[in-house]
């Protein structure tokens, strides 16, 4: 199965930490947040992972490489452009990262999962997929309620 990890953001809410490392690389109990995600994806049968990167991209790509260490294949989609031989990061936001999926049409030819690279998820991904398939829906989204006063600290889903 296939998954996409959104890991291109600048992590402005946790500066100054993210001036030196991208948010998915912030260590929790000795390893980067995103490593927990890669392990969880592998445990649930996701063996091909596309990661969109931008801010300090080389840190993520250098650490995770081709994914072999976790028994998965990892590919990268860089958000930015080349200027005189240098790569210039230019993140386009979560929606932009997901929109770029079109650039990898052959990669995303079946059911796939999109997760944020800076979030620890306590969720049975196999059960989520099973429920999605049973529903017959084109797309499913897993979200949680957040108290109104905490909304500014989280992403917002308008339904």
Predicted regions and their residues:
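Unchanged
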Residues: 1-159
């Amino acid at each position: 199965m296939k998954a996409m990890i959104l890991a291109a953001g600048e992590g402005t809410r946790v500066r100054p930490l993210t001036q030196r490392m991208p948010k998915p690389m912030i260590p929790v109990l000795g390893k980067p947040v995103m490593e927990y995600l890669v392990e969880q994806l592998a445990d649930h049968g996701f063996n091909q992972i596309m990661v969109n990167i931008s801010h300090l991209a080389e840190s993520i790509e250098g650490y995770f490489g081709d994914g072999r260490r976790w028994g998965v294949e990892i590919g990268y989609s860089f958000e930015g452009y080349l200027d005189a031989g240098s790569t210039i990061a230019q993140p386009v936001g979560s929606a932009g990262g997901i929109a770029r999926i079109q650039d990898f049409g052959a990669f995303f030819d079946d059911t796939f999962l999109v997760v944020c690279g800076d979030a620890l998820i306590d969720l049975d991904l196999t059960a989520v997929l099973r429920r999605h398939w049973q529903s017959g829906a084109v797309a499913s989204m897993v979200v949680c309620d957040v108290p109104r006063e905490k909304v500014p600290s989280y992403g917002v889903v308008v339904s």
